[in-house]
Amino acid sequence: MRLPIFLDTDPGIDDAVAIAAAIFAPELDLQLMTTVAGNVSVEKTTRNALQLLHFWNAEIPLAQGAAVPLVRAPRDAASVHGESGMAGYDFVEHNRKPLGIPAFLAIRDALMRAPEPVTLVAIGPLTNIALLLSQCPECKPYIRRLVIMGGSAGRGNCTPNAEFNIAADPEAAACVFRSGIEIVMCGLDVTNQAILTPDYLSTLPQLNRTGKMLHALFSHYRSGSMQSGLRMHDLCAIAWLVRPDLFTLKPCFVAVETQGEFTSGTTVVDIDGCLGKPANVQVALDLDVKGFQQWVAEVLALAS
């Protein structure tokens, strides 16, 4: 039986790979997509997501979400993904539009209609998920779990300690981590290992139309290089759904720093239980890299 999922995303070049896997992995049933401001503005992430759905002829509803964080000014990652978020490939024109309601309400409505609890996957800032949990707490029993790409038990990637998706809206992340729902966190500890090698990248143009498109996007992606390999951060959240055996997880108490002058957005991961607080997150700490690379090759071969 395929696993029903809703995907909250901010495309973003590595998001495009994660979306491909969510659509084409035979184990998954992608039923709803929502967008959030993150890598670029929400208008751009929505445009990019619709372009990808049209490219794959995927009839999946999409709702546009939060344009700004809960409290603070927005930040982006255009330096990594380019000003448009997905530069490098000329997508054809289409007339697709997002749903006419905000993302968190679209998630609420879809959860309440679902015949069974649904897994939420968030690979951008957690603003939409925080709005859902704070404004619609009645939805919690209908959430099977939340799988996120975000955070780190060690170094950050936009500050010394903070990972971008959490740092972009720390208050939202803090709300989500306090919510009591089941959370799996695929942070930089594993995503920095999730590298597609130059040898594999060179085969993409011959793979299929998706391979050609992704190869064009990757030439503008600044999380590594075509010569040294590219990190597929967001793809790890999808990989865990399909191949949890590739990941080493540990239950930990995790809090999000929202006040620190130098540490705002840091995920404080209590690996050794120093704080004496009960675990609220399953934290991915290690990855079977070769197994991950093999799985990526298999799923992208299906993305025709």
Swiss-Prot record:
Its EC number is 3.2.-.-. GO terms for biological process: DNA damage response; purine nucleobase metabolic process; purine nucleoside catabolic process; pyrimidine nucleobase metabolic process; ribonucleoside catabolic process. Keywords: Glycosidase, Hydrolase. GO terms for cellular component: cytosol. Pfam families: IU_nuc_hydro. One of its GO terms (molecular function) is ribosylpyrimidine nucleosidase activity. Subject to catabolite repression. PROSITE patterns: IUNH (PS01247). CDD domains: nuc_hydro_IU_UC_XIUA. The active site is at H233. InterPro entries: I/U_nuclsd_hydro_CS (IPR015910), Inosine/uridine_hydrolase_dom (IPR001910), IUNH (IPR023186), Nucleosid_hydro_RihC_nonspecif (IPR022976), Ribo_hydro-like (IPR036452). Hydrolyzes both purine and pyrimidine ribonucleosides with a broad-substrate specificity with decreasing activity in the order uridine, xanthosine, inosine, adenosine, cytidine, guanosine. Belongs to the IUNH family. RihC subfamily. Strictly specific for ribonucleosides. NCBIfam families: PRK10768.1 (NF008036). HAMAP family: Nucleosid_hydro_RihC (MF_01432). This is Non-specific ribonucleoside hydrolase RihC. The gene is rihC.
